């Protein structure tokens, strides 16, 4: 981050707003003594890891079915604000540490990670506004010029859709594009062709939480076949120009040591072999949460079997947590981490986790949540950290497209300095 004379935090406001699923979430505004203001909104997940930081909900069934966040908002006004008012907005680490200390719990359950994160991000945005520079430049400095390869979730299943598909996300990745703008166009064209393919087969449905189609299909393999057909129909070469990726979210169908999919139970090794078969049959370059979040020994087997060929991303397994990431590094488990700000709860801890991953040659994928807002922080974060990949949903629903549009603007701002991650080997492991 850039150095600047101290600018104290003067005021903090917070409110309960709605996310993209119509559920309450937290918005915070941080105002500095100079008048600069930063605003941030926090997302929430549908498929959540057991070890994520605590999202504080009211539990009052008379409001939003118990999902209200008025306690989190009150915590910002009554507990967080008094702790950090007059602190230097440019000292992000100290601001975040003060909130962590004020909370005093391992998973932020006292104040709520949703309360802490909203203030953490709003503080960084206020500091960037004070300097009159974009957030990505404030966080990453002058070398922040790499636009990420998008993981576009165009077919939904699992916890993200009301259908009979086991795996949660089937994604396309434009690995052969020359720029982010071109990659986005390719993805949008494939998405449009997918709509046509589904319509022809009388499978066209509404979209899931993240904007992907959610048809009832006979198997997970049928979803991959549909993507291959859509890529071909759009005029692109699968594997060369556009690759496939999956979020299996296997914790959702793991029970009593077995994986239950396609209507029957399977041992961990049978499931690993099934994933291996899919990788051999389709141009899959990335699998997220290939095994359940506490199935560490079998994760090691999965990594040994597939890790040299594709990217194996830990989401529920690692929950943006440096302690769990260090365990994975020590065990040789996975080779990439999904980064979700609200899983850990502060900007500082998020950046520390990304740094730990980078130092140990693990890739980072910056990610949204299924319950999103119009906040575009993750787009700036992807560029600031040179992560090389971003996962922010499909090519429809404005809370998803907002992140893509922000990346288009960043690419335009950078001009000739902009580099598409796939061109310099920062895309998915292949």
Curated annotation (Swiss-Prot):
Pathway the protein contributes to: Carbohydrate degradation; glycolysis; pyruvate from D-glyceraldehyde 3-phosphate: step 4/5
One Gene Ontology term from the biological process aspect of the record: glycolytic process
Chief localization: cytoplasm
Co-factor binding comment: Binds a second Mg(2+) ion via substrate during catalysis.
One MF term in the entry's GO annotations: magnesium ion binding
Active site: 210, 340
Cofactor(s) listed: Mg(2+)
Cited Gene3D superfamilies: Enolase-like C-terminal domain, Enolase-like, N-terminal domain
Signal peptide extent: none
Pfam families listed in its UniProt record: Enolase_C, Enolase_N
Binding site for (2R)-2-phosphoglycerate: 168, 340, 369-370, 391
Homology family: Belongs to the enolase family.
Function: Catalyzes the reversible conversion of 2-phosphoglycerate (2-PG) into phosphoenolpyruvate (PEP). It is essential for the degradation of carbohydrates via glycolysis.
Protein name: Enolase
Organism per entry: Gloeothece citriformis (strain PCC 7424) (Cyanothece sp. (strain PCC 7424))
Gene: eno
């Amino acid at each position: 981050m850039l150095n600047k004379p101290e600018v104290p935090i003067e005021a903090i406001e917070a409110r309960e707003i709605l996310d993209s699923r119509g559920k309450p979430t937290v918005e915070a505004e941080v105002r500095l003594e100079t008048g600069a203001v930063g605003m941030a909104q926090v997302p929430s997940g549908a498929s959540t890891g057991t070890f994520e930081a605590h999202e504080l909900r009211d539990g009052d069934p008379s409001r939003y079915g118990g999902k209200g966040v008025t306690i989190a908002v009150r915590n910002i006004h009554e507990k967080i604000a008094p702790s950090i008012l007059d602190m230097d907005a440019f000292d992000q680490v100290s601001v975040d540490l003060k909130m962590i200390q004020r909370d005093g719990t391992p998973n932020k359950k006292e104040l709520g990670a949703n309360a802490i994160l909203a203030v953490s991000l709003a503080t960084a945005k206020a500091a960037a506004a004070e300097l009159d520079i974009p957030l990505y430049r404030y966080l990453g400095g002058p070398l922040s010029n790499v636009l990420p390869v998008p993981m576009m979730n165009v077919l939904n299943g699992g916890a993200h859709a009301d259908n009979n598909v086991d795996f949660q996300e089937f994604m396309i990745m434009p690995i052969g594009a020359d720029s982010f703008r071109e990659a986005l166009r390719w993805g949008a064209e494939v998405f449009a062709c997918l709509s046509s393919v589904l319509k022809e087969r009388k499978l066209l449905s509404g979209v899931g939480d993240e904007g992907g189609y959610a048809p009832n299909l006979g198997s997970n393999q049928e979803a991959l076949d549909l993507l291959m057909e859509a890529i071909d129909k759009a005029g692109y070469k699968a594997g060369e120009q556009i690759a496939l990726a999956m979020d299996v979210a296997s914790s959702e169908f793991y029970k009593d040591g077995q994986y239950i999919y396609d209507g029957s139970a399977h041992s961990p090794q049978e499931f690993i072999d099934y994933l291996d078969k899919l990788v051999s049959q389709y141009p899959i370059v990335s699998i997220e949460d290939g095994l359940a979040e506490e199935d560490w020994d079998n994760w090691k087997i999965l990594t040994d079997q597939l890790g040299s060929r594709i990217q194996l991303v830990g989401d529920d397994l690692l929950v943006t947590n440096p302690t769990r990431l260090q365990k994975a590094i020590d065990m040789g488990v996975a080779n990439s981490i999904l980064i979700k700000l609200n899983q850990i709860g502060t900007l500082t801890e998020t950046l520390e986790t990304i740094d730990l991953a980078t130092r140990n040659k693990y890739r980072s994928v910056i990610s949204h949540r299924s319950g999103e807002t119009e906040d575009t922080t993750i787009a700036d974060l992807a560029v600031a950290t040179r992560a090389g990949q971003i996962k922010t949903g499909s090519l429809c629903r404005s809370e998803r497209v907002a992140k893509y549009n922000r990346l288009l603007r960043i690419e335009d701002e950078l001009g000739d300095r902009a580099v598409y991650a796939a061109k310099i080997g920062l895309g998915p492991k292949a």
